Amino acid sequence: MENKFFAAFFLLLVLFSSQEIIGGEGRTCQSKSHHFKYMCTSNHNCAIVCRNEGFSGGRCHGFHRRCYCTRLC
C-alpha cells in the first residue's frame, strides 16, 4: 500500500513539475521588416526601425541575420 502511495505521489510530482507556466502576455507574432535592408547586427537598431514601422519591437533572426519585427497577435 505504501509503495502505491509513493508511486502515485511521485507521478503527480513529475506531472506538475513539467507544466509550463504561461504568462498573461499572449502570443508574439513576427514579420520581416520592410525598411531594414541590410544584414542585422544589432537587436537595438532593429527594434528602433520596427517601432517606426508601427510594431512593438524587433530582433535579428536567422542564418542571414534579417530584422524581424514583433507585436502581440
From Swiss-Prot:
Keywords: Antimicrobial, Disulfide bond, Fungicide, Plant defense, Secreted, Signal. Its main location: secreted. GO terms for cellular component: extracellular region. It is found in: Secreted. Residues 1-26 form the signal peptide. Disulfide bonds join C29-C73, C40-C60, C46-C67, C50-C69. GO terms for biological process: defense response; defense response to fungus; killing of cells of another organism. Confers broad-spectrum resistance to pathogens. Belongs to the DEFL family. This is Defensin-like protein 6. It comes from Arabidopsis thaliana (Mouse-ear cress). The gene is PDF2.5.
